[in-house]
Structures are given as structure tokens and as C-alpha cells.
């Protein structure tokens, strides 16, 4: 479904001339339907797609990644921005509940990127066919609860962030694998 800005309901976004639109998908089915449009639009399956994975609370660095993704897929391509605060990256007692959840502001920022006339300070204008924002809940990402199969990150799990947050890297690998599968 497409998202109006600034409201968080599901309805079309008016696009700037020559630009695509923002679609908000909250469920696996909505994401699949949004991605299927690419398949119907190009029978060869050749619509370029880029995925920018985030936990939301978007800032200029995220917008730069989205702009680069759009540059790489070109005007006929699709950029998928995922916004998901992954509970598997947080151990008990960590800051999961304190992590900012700013979906409406994030979508507004992405819409501004899509509509901007250009220039690094105003976010570069995206010449991209479509921008899909996939913002699932934990229940959507992990419909059967915690995954039955876990990915072992190996020795990296005990250094860097893993030295103080032992579940962090396993959670990151799990969400990346799941998002890659859902956006393929």
C-alpha cells in the first residue's frame, strides 16, 4: 500500500513530477504485493532493486545510503528501505524499549528525499521508479516466535559489540537473512 505523508494511514503519496512514489508495507503480504509490481512491470525480472536495512530513527547517513541506492538502481529501479527494531539484537535488560521508533518522521524524511530538487543539504533528489518502506512488527518478522534455527556468528560474537552484548551479532545475522529472503 502507499502511504500519505504526514499521516500514517495507508493511501497514495503524491509524487513530484518525474519521480516515483513511496509505498509503506507493514506485513509480509503487503511487501510481497509491492515487490510483485516490479515483476508485472518487467516480464524479464530485470527491474533493479536495492535494499537499505535500518532500525529507523533515520538521519543524513541513512538518507545518503538511500540516495546512493537510488543512483545505482536508476530511474526504473526500486529501493526498499527496511525499518525494523530487531528484538533479537538485544539481550534481557538491554535498551530495546528505549530505542527510538520514529516511523512517521522516517517516512516523511524519505518522502523529502524522493521529492527534493537536489543538493546534498536537501538530500539528493531520487531518480528512482519506486521507494518501498518495509516497517514490520516483531510478530510479522518472526510469526512463529523466536526462530527455530539460529545463525552462529562464530568468534566475532565475542568481540566488539559482542563482548558486552552476547546476542547482538546472532540477532543481526538473523534479521539480515530474513530481510534478504523477504526482499529478494
Predicted regions mapped to residue ranges:
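Nucleotidyltransferase catalytic core that binds NTPs
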Residues: 2-184
Amino acid at each position: 500500500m502507499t502511504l500519505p505523508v504526514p499521516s500514517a494511514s495507508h493511501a497514495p503519496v503524491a509524487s513530484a513530477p518525474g519521480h516515483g512514489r513511496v509505498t509503506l508495507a507493514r506485513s509480509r503480504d503487503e511487501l510481497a504485493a509491492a515487490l510483485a509490481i516490479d515483476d508485472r512491470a518487467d516480464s524479464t525480472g530485470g527491474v533493479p532493486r536495492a535494499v537499505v536495512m535500518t532500525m529507523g530513527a533515520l538521519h543524513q547517513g541513512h538518507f545518503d545510503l538511500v540516495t546512493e541506492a537510488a543512483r545505482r538502481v536508476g530511474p526504473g529501479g526500486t529501493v526498499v528501505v527496511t525499518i525494523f527494531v530487531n528484538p533479537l539484537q538485544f539481550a534481557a535488560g538491554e535498551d530495546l524499549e528505549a530505542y527510538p521508533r520514529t516511523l512517521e518522521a522516517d517516512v516523511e524524511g524519505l518522502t523529502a528525499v524522493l521529492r527534493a530538487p537536489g543538493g546534498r543539504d536537501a538530500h539528493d533528489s531520487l531518480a528512482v521508479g519506486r521507494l518501498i518502506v518495509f516497517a514490520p512488527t516483531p510478530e510479522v518478522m518472526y510469526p512463529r516466535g523466536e526462530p527455530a534455527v539460529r545463525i552462529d556468528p562464530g568468534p566475532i560474537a565475542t568481540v566488539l559489540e559482542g563482548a558486552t552484548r552476547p546476542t547482538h551479532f546472532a540477532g543481526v545475522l538473523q534479521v539480515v537473512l530474513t530481510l534478504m529472503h523477504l526482499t529478494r
